[in-house]
């Protein structure tokens, strides 16, 4: 028997009696009300619906899925032979741009399409709701724990469940002196037994778990919660109204992106992280050919994962295919290098290209010209290590490198303006997420500004190392030291074409200026 969710519009259940049936029950799928499916309680009696009773036609199962129709424009695309490998990789993302629809599927709330914070995930996983402050003290299942030190929570204080000790500590910190300094590395463990050992790390963790000044009383912040819910409902109403009126979908998708909070965006970037690529280390000693073969194979594998990572960034697949390819071609080596720096940040003097491919600086001497690039990578990694770069900061910085790599104009002026507006919107969202991550560290406003500036200034060093690496790869390709295939070859060819275009344009402009100057000098002589 095929059991499915009933449409949400069926609000009047018709009881079914096995002994005496008023209406004949035709054979077909049986639809189970969603209230029974989604509830966690067990019911002794369940009401069933038949499509024939409710005058609904059964979808034809001979088609591809029950009542499912794809709106994918895949049939309109040219064959892969007319597109580059990178365009084919990016083009597949459009298959998932529009969700599949079915006449028997319920309309999900928009909030389920966005990532939620860890506290919400914990509550959903445990099956208990923390939305209500009323809990039974007699049952340990309903007991809440302090989000800071994991002790038993006394209530909902400053926006989170916390104990009396952490509540009082946070109150003293926000009302008085809070310029605490960690005697260690700002990574102290804060738990029930060691929460008093370091005030700086305790305050930092208070901010990390979400403590805010306005959350001192749940009732006092009630109007903020209601107002936030009202704004969310109004935004959803505007989105549905915009869709009904046939407004451009780009505006709707921009509103969806703006609905993401910085925390949700960071969690999305965390989920989008590509997996580690394993490479077998060649037998020692290294030669120029063996090392370059290992590095180019690794880069080609990482490029495939990098395209998948880019498509998971909120709003990236909403860009045109041309813009997606242009951004990836402009920054692919920078993204790979900043990932290399993050893997090597805890290993001074070493470059962790892969978990099984670790190179020392001196091992680069076997390849002509690569030792200078190794030194640049190690120097920038050392600077990130001095700043104690955090993982969430690294996620935001890597996304900023991708979205800030647009250096070439679009085909037309209108396309240039539209793509510039979309990219600016995406870049602002990622920048807000980076600012939010730095603010959660508990530093003063001046220290936060300095840290943001230091992180952004290091991006120029990453770009410089990328330019050197690109030049070295092109030289190795021209000398036929190592064969280059697939996506890596496509990226190198795109870089060659783009770097030659400005030179041709500049030479043509110089020739035009010379001809104009000659004509201007000949006219007075003729007179």
Swiss-Prot record:
<keyword id="KW-0238">DNA-binding</keyword>
<feature type="modified residue" description="Phosphoserine; by MAPK">
    <location>
        <position position="102"/>
    </location>
</feature>
<dbReference type="InterPro" id="IPR001723">
    <property type="entry name" value="Nuclear_hrmn_rcpt"/>
</dbReference>
<keyword id="KW-0539">Nucleus</keyword>
<dbReference type="GO" id="GO:0000122">
    <property type="term" value="P:negative regulation of transcription by RNA polymerase II"/>
</dbReference>
<feature type="zinc finger region" description="NR C4-type">
    <location>
        <begin position="182"/>
        <end position="206"/>
    </location>
</feature>
<keyword id="KW-0010">Activator</keyword>
<dbReference type="InterPro" id="IPR021064">
    <property type="entry name" value="ER-beta-like_N"/>
</dbReference>
<dbReference type="InterPro" id="IPR035500">
    <property type="entry name" value="NHR-like_dom_sf"/>
</dbReference>
<dbReference type="Pfam" id="PF00105">
    <property type="entry name" value="zf-C4"/>
</dbReference>
<dbReference type="InterPro" id="IPR050200">
    <property type="entry name" value="Nuclear_hormone_rcpt_NR3"/>
</dbReference>
<dbReference type="GO" id="GO:0005496">
    <property type="term" value="F:steroid binding"/>
</dbReference>
<dbReference type="GO" id="GO:0005739">
    <property type="term" value="C:mitochondrion"/>
</dbReference>
<dbReference type="GO" id="GO:0008270">
    <property type="term" value="F:zinc ion binding"/>
</dbReference>
<keyword id="KW-0754">Steroid-binding</keyword>
<dbReference type="GO" id="GO:0019899">
    <property type="term" value="F:enzyme binding"/>
</dbReference>
<dbReference type="InterPro" id="IPR013088">
    <property type="entry name" value="Znf_NHR/GATA"/>
</dbReference>
<dbReference type="GO" id="GO:0071392">
    <property type="term" value="P:cellular response to estradiol stimulus"/>
</dbReference>
<protein>
    <recommendedName>
        <fullName>Estrogen receptor beta</fullName>
    </recommendedName>
</protein>
<keyword id="KW-0446">Lipid-binding</keyword>
<dbReference type="InterPro" id="IPR024178">
    <property type="entry name" value="Est_rcpt/est-rel_rcp"/>
</dbReference>
<feature type="domain" description="NR LBD">
    <location>
        <begin position="261"/>
        <end position="495"/>
    </location>
</feature>
<comment type="function">
    <text>Nuclear hormone receptor. Binds estrogens with an affinity similar to that of ESR1/ER-alpha, and activates expression of reporter genes containing estrogen response elements (ERE) in an estrogen-dependent manner.</text>
</comment>
<keyword id="KW-0804">Transcription</keyword>
<keyword id="KW-0597">Phosphoprotein</keyword>
<dbReference type="GO" id="GO:0005654">
    <property type="term" value="C:nucleoplasm"/>
</dbReference>
<comment type="subunit">
    <text>Binds DNA as a homodimer. Can form a heterodimer with ESR1. Interacts with NCOA1, NCOA3, NCOA5 and NCOA6 coactivators, leading to a strong increase of transcription of target genes. Interacts with UBE1C and AKAP13. Interacts with DNTTIP2. Interacts with CCDC62 in the presence of estradiol/E2; this interaction seems to enhance the transcription of target genes. Interacts with DNAAF4. Interacts with PRMT2. Interacts with CCAR2 (via N-terminus) in a ligand-independent manner. Interacts with RBM39, in the presence of estradiol (E2). Interacts with STUB1/CHIP.</text>
</comment>
<feature type="zinc finger region" description="NR C4-type">
    <location>
        <begin position="146"/>
        <end position="166"/>
    </location>
</feature>
<keyword id="KW-0479">Metal-binding</keyword>
<dbReference type="GO" id="GO:0005634">
    <property type="term" value="C:nucleus"/>
</dbReference>
<feature type="region of interest" description="Modulating">
    <location>
        <begin position="1"/>
        <end position="145"/>
    </location>
</feature>
<dbReference type="GO" id="GO:0051091">
    <property type="term" value="P:positive regulation of DNA-binding transcription factor activity"/>
</dbReference>
<keyword id="KW-0805">Transcription regulation</keyword>
<feature type="modified residue" description="Phosphoserine; by MAPK">
    <location>
        <position position="84"/>
    </location>
</feature>
<dbReference type="Pfam" id="PF12497">
    <property type="entry name" value="ERbeta_N"/>
</dbReference>
<keyword id="KW-0675">Receptor</keyword>
<dbReference type="InterPro" id="IPR001628">
    <property type="entry name" value="Znf_hrmn_rcpt"/>
</dbReference>
<feature type="region of interest" description="Disordered">
    <location>
        <begin position="505"/>
        <end position="527"/>
    </location>
</feature>
<dbReference type="GO" id="GO:0045893">
    <property type="term" value="P:positive regulation of DNA-templated transcription"/>
</dbReference>
<feature type="DNA-binding region" description="Nuclear receptor">
    <location>
        <begin position="146"/>
        <end position="211"/>
    </location>
</feature>
<dbReference type="Pfam" id="PF00104">
    <property type="entry name" value="Hormone_recep"/>
</dbReference>
<keyword id="KW-0862">Zinc</keyword>
């Amino acid at each position: 028997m095929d059991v499915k969710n009933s449409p949400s519009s069926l609000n009047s259940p018709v009881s079914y009696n096995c002994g005496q049936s008023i209406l004949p029950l035709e054979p077909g799928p049986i639809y189970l009300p969603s209230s029974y499916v989604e509830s966690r309680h067990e019911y002794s009696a369940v009401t069933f619906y038949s499509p024939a009773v409710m005058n609904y036609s059964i979808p034809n199962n001979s088609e591809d899925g029950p009542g499912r129709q794809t709106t994918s424009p895949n049939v309109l695309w040219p064959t892969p032979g007319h597109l580059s490998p990178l365009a084919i990789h990016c083009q597949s993302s459009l298959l998932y741009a529009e969700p599949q629809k079915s006449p028997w599927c319920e309309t999900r709330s928009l909030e389920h399409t966005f990532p939620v914070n860890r506290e919400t995930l914990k509550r959903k996983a445990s099956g208990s709701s923390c939305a209500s402050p009323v809990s039974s003290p007699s049952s340990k299942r309903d007991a809440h724990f302090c989000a800071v030190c994991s002790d038993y929570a006394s209530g909902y204080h400053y926006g989170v469940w916390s104990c009396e000790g952490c509540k009082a500590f946070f109150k003293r910190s926000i009302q008085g002196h809070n310029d605490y300094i960690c005697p260690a590395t700002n990574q102290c463990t804060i738990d029930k037994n060691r929460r008093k050992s370091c005030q700086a790390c305790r305050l930092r963790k208070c901010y990390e778990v979400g403590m805010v000044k306005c959350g001192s009383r749940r009732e006092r912040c009630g109007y903020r919660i209601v107002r936030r819910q009202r704004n969310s409902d109004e935004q959803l109403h505007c989105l549905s109204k915009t869709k009904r009126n046939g407004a451009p979908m780009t505006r709707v998708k921009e509103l969806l992106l703006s609905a993401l909070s910085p925390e949700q965006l960071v969690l999305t970037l965390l989920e989008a992280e590509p997996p580690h690529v394993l490479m077998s280390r060649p037998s020692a000693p290294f030669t120029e050919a063996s090392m370059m073969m290992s590095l180019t194979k690794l880069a080609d594998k990482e490029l495939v994962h990098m395209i998948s990572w880019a498509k998971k960034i909120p709003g990236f697949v909403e860009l045109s295919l041309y813009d997606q390819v242009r951004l990836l071609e402009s920054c692919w080596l920078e993204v790979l290098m900043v990932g290399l720096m993050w893997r090597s940040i805890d290993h001074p003097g070493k470059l962790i290209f892969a978990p099984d491919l670790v190179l020392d600086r001196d091992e680069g001497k076997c390849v002509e010209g690569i030792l200078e690039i190794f030194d640049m990578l190690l120097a920038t990694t050392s600077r990130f290590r001095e700043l104690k770069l955090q993982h969430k900061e690294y996620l935001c910085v890597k996304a900023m490198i991708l979205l800030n790599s647009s250096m070439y104009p679009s085909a037309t002026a209108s396309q240039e303006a539209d793509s510039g507006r979309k990219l600016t919107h995406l870049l602002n969202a990622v920048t807000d997420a980076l600012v939010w991550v730095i603010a959660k560290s508990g530093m003063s406003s001046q220290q936060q500004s300095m840290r943001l500036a230091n992180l952004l200034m290091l991006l120029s060093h990453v770009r410089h190392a990328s330019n050197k690496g690109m030049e070295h790869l092109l030289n190795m390709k021209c000398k036929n030291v190592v064969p280059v295939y697939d996506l890596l070859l496509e990226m190198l060819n795109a870089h060659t074409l783009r770097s030659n275009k400005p030179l041709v344009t500049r030479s043509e402009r110089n020739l035009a200026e010379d001809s104009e100057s000659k004509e201007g000098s000949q006219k007075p002589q003729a007179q």
